[in-house]
Amino acid sequence: MEEKQPQKTKEPSKEDEPQQKEMPTHLSLGAESKAEAKTPVLVETQTVDNANEKSEKPPENQKKLSDKDTVATKIQAWWRGTLVRRALLHAALSACIIQCWWRLILSKILKKRRQAALEAFSRKEWAAVTLQSQARMWRIRRRYCQVLNAVRIIQAYWRCRSCASRGFIKGQYRVTANQLHLQLEILLDSGPCIVTECIPFSIKE
């Protein structure tokens, strides 16, 4: 409103100069106080504007820190992955080594068991063979003794008869596995008499 109403300016005269010289002291004090009052407001507005700018635009340092954090997390994740893979590989190799060792031990154990089974079977087989051979030998010997006893009885009988008839008896025999071949020659006064006979054995298999 004050700008629209022009005021008439009076040209200063020489008489008014001393009054104008005295007035600046009072005016300077008022202007200085007004300037001092306005400066804090300007400072406050500048700080608020700077704060708004800071809140709107994050500083480059924070961006760098966030980038560093992401890179660090990536490196840590990679290192953890390598550690886990290394541990898994070590565990797999250890398991493979243990399996190979256990397979070798099992093969040795099975080989020993087979060897022991073969030895036991061979011992049993040999024992059975020896028992069978001993039994056969005992049976044949007993039959041989029976035949020999019979031959001796026959010889004694013929000797007694030859003595009674004043003759002479001569004979021979041959024993095989199944029968007895007997051949007797009796010499009497009337003439020789030859007797041959085959006596089979009753062998039960």
From Swiss-Prot:
Record-given protein name: IQ domain-containing protein F1
GO annotation terms (biological process): positive regulation of acrosome reaction; positive regulation of flagellated sperm motility involved in capacitation
TM region positions: none
Function: Involved in sperm capacitation and acrosome reaction.
Keyword Repeat recorded: yes
Keyword Acyltransferase among UniProt keywords: no
Any Pfam family the entry gives: IQ
IQ domain ranges (all copies): 68-97, 124-153
